């Protein structure tokens, strides 16, 4: 084996072992202190829920914060293909590929397609302590696949990925340090947004960085070893190889597009005001929104105020609507039909309803599931 390659293998093995050891040890201590819930108790309010995450820039980061990383992944793949035939850029080909693979494999496959789907950790807003319906699970505690997609944080990976620019240390230490700072800073911002929105714990964000770092180490030291390509000369590529590369790149671009489309953040808010007749003696809500998603407040208002927030992930062009209709029976029962409708594909959707009702209906309110 080439001594240089052997050296990379050894360095990679040591770094990966240390990296995972630090992450596992820190997580054990973190869980012991119950730090995830301690922090979230300072953010969540029984009265206002996760309202801190509704403001800016947190909403903007949730809806659009992943776009820069997706765009750079596209550009890196195309740059890698062009660099294969460019004497000026040939030495950077493995660097371009390193970024692309770290993004596609680390963020796309390991985090979003594997860990989030199969670890079964409920999001903070889904656990009983914070107004949800499920049992809390600590980081690295496996749950029921599909019952929660909190671990790790997908949005956070799209911030931390920029730290992979540290690979340019041999060419420009300032660029490498700047990229590292950008990645850690942007990843922290994305993490804060998701924390305030009740979508993730601190440990979810911590492990997003952990997975991205481990993926980067594996590709850098065991697979690509970019510095060894600095002296490589441009070689003529056969038409057959070109077509294979084009097909491979196209497949990767399709994969990126699918991952982006199905993990595209979605948020919609509806408010409905329902007038209540003086003859109304009882309110019957007939709805397809589960009872555990309703937060009812009896206040000094003259009418019924309904606020519904729908958030999750949706395919482009998908949308959400809310139909509300009323009917007063001769017995004084006002039936309010609340029908939540989705159009398109939603890999994940959470609905939360805040209902303000006149005090006179405090013991005269019932909820009936809407028949399928």
PLM regions: where:
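Membrane-interface loops
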Residues: 38, 87, 91-181
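Acidic (Asp/Glu) and glycine-rich low-complexity loops/linkers
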Residues: 261-282, 293-372
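Membrane-helix interface linkers and caps
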Residues: 2-3, 45, 77-95
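Alpha-helical membrane-inserting segments
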Residues: 25, 29, 74-78, 105, ...
């Amino acid at each position: 084996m080439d001594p240089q390659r052997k050296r990379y293998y050894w360095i990679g093995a040591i770094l990966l072992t240390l990296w995972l050891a630090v992450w596992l040890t820190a997580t054990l201590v973190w869980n012991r202190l119950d730090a995830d819930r301690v922090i979230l108790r300072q953010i969540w309010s029984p009265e206002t829920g996760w309202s801190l995450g509704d403001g800016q820039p947190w909403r903007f980061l949730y809806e659009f914060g992943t776009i820069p990383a997706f765009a750079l992944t596209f550009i890196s793949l195309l740059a890698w293909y062009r660099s294969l035939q460019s004497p000026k850029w040939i030495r950077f080909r493995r660097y371009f590929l390193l970024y692309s693979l770290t993004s596609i494999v680390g963020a796309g496959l390991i985090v979003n397609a594997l860990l989030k789907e199969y670890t079964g950790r409920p999001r903070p807003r889904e656990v009983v302590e914070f107004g949800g319906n499920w049992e809390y699970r600590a980081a690295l505690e496996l749950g029921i696949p599909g019952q929660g997609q909190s671990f790790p944080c997908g949005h956070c990976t799209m911030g931390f990925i920029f730290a992979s620019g540290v690979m340019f240390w041999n060419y420009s230490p300032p660029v490498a340090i700047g990229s590292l700072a950008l990645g850690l800073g942007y990843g922290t911002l994305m993490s804060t947004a998701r924390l305030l929105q009740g979508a993730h714990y601190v440990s979810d964000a911590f492990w997003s960085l952990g997975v991205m770092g481990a993926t980067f180490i594996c590709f850098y030291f065991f697979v690509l070893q970019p510095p060894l390509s600095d002296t490589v000369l441009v070689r003529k590529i056969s038409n057959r190889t070109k077509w294979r590369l084009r097909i491979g790149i196209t497949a990767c671009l399709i994969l990126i597009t699918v991952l982006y489309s199905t993990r595209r953040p979605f948020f919609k808010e509806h408010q409905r005001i329902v007038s209540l007749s003086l003859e109304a003696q009882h309110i019957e809500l007939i709805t397809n929104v589960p009872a555990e998603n309703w937060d009812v407040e009896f206040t000094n208002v003259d009418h019924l105020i309904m606020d519904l927030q729908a958030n999750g992930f949706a395919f482009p062009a998908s949308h959400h609507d809310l139909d509300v209709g009323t009917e007063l029976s001769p017995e004084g029962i006002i039936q309010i039909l609340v029908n939540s409708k989705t159009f398109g594909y939603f890999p994940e959707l959470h609905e939360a309803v805040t209902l303000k009702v006149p005090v006179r209906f405090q013991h005269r309110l019932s909820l009936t599931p809407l028949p399928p």
